[in-house]
Swiss-Prot record:
Chain's role: Specific inhibitor of cysteine proteinases. Probably involved in the regulation of endogenous processes and in defense against pests and pathogens.
Residues with attached carbohydrate: 37
Protein known as: Cysteine proteinase inhibitor 4
SMART domains the record matches: CY
Organism phylogeny: Eukaryota, Viridiplantae, Streptophyta, Embryophyta, Tracheophyta
GO molecular function: cysteine-type endopeptidase inhibitor activity
Family, per entry: Belongs to the cystatin family. Phytocystatin subfamily.
Species this protein is from: Arabidopsis thaliana
């Protein structure tokens, strides 16, 4: 009887484990995932936030052009590692790397780093 119970339990739990692993995109909890749609309004909003915060801190006047590429990682919130194209004060388009952590439940974002590439 005990063996039948273990077999039944295994048959129930194994598919559940597979589903949970599948939801993680194959990378596991905390792994980086490429952003498939860099034009997604939420991604663009995070990139614009990064530029606005950088402009405040540095007194530069960068203007957002587009998100070139990026990854997300679930940490204590969502960590965005973005490559952003922006125009500098002279009108030249350059690429920048920004790291932003967004905590939706707290309605907060923080710019962790921003640098020219």
């Amino acid at each position: 009887m005990m063996m039948k119970s273990l077999i039944c339990l295994s048959l129930i739990l194994l598919p559940l484990v597979s589903v949970v692993e599948g939801l993680g995109g194959g990378g596991g909890l905390g792994s980086r995932k490429p952003i498939k749609n860099v034009s997604d309004p939420d991604v663009v909003a995070v990139a614009k936030y990064a530029i606005e915060e950088h402009n405040k801190e540095s007194k530069e006047k960068l203007v957002f052009v587009k998100v070139v590429e990026g990854t997300t990682q679930v940490v204590s919130g969502t960590k965005y590692d973005l490559k952003i194209a922006a125009k500098d004060g002279g009108g030249k388009i350059k690429n920048y790397e920004a790291v932003v952590v967004e905590k939706l439940w707290l309605h907060s974002k923080s710019l962790e780093s921003f640098k020219a590439l």
